[in-house]
């Protein structure tokens, strides 16, 4: 298994883009970026950090690039950066010893490109997770609703540095 650096960029300006990622090996094993999980809680009021479950499939929110351990072989790749960019859904080949994967996302040319996109009601996530998911989903605004309750912190996307 090789640790591969994966990056997605805007094809117009070559700047990194936050994105949603799903990679499944031809043997059915899902690839998981470092710092993310394949199995996580999906119950109401439980923040899930840098991953999400959509129609029974696990996706990972990535801030522009990630390190991902990959076996050589063919993978089905799904890479999306909101509705302003054409998603990439295709089969790719990872060769033995390959160190990097780079993807350019093409901007969509559609009538709503100058509109503001927002999620007006987000619960049970930290500001860092809301920023990551909103950016990867192509949102301009995320309205994070705060409330007070006591719960265990399990947000792997929020950990930066050493815990003391």
Where are these regions (language model features)?
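Short, surface-exposed beta-strand/beta-hairpin micro-motifs centered on an aromatic residue
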Residues: 58, 63-70
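Short, ordered, surface-exposed loop/turn motifs in non-cytosolic proteins
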Residues: 12-50, 139
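Extracellular Ig-like/FN3 beta-sandwich strand-entry sites
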Residues: 1, 72-74, 98
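Extracellular beta-sheet/turn segments enriched in Thr/Pro/Gly and aliphatic residues
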Residues: 92-110
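Catalytic cores of extracellular degradative/oxidative enzymes
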Residues: 114-164
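A short, solvent-exposed beta-strand micro-motif common in secreted/extracellular proteins
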Residues: 50-58, 72-82
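Short acidic/polar inter-strand loop motif in beta-rich domains
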Residues: 82-88
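A short, amphipathic beta-strand motif
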Residues: 2-12, 21-23, 75, 103
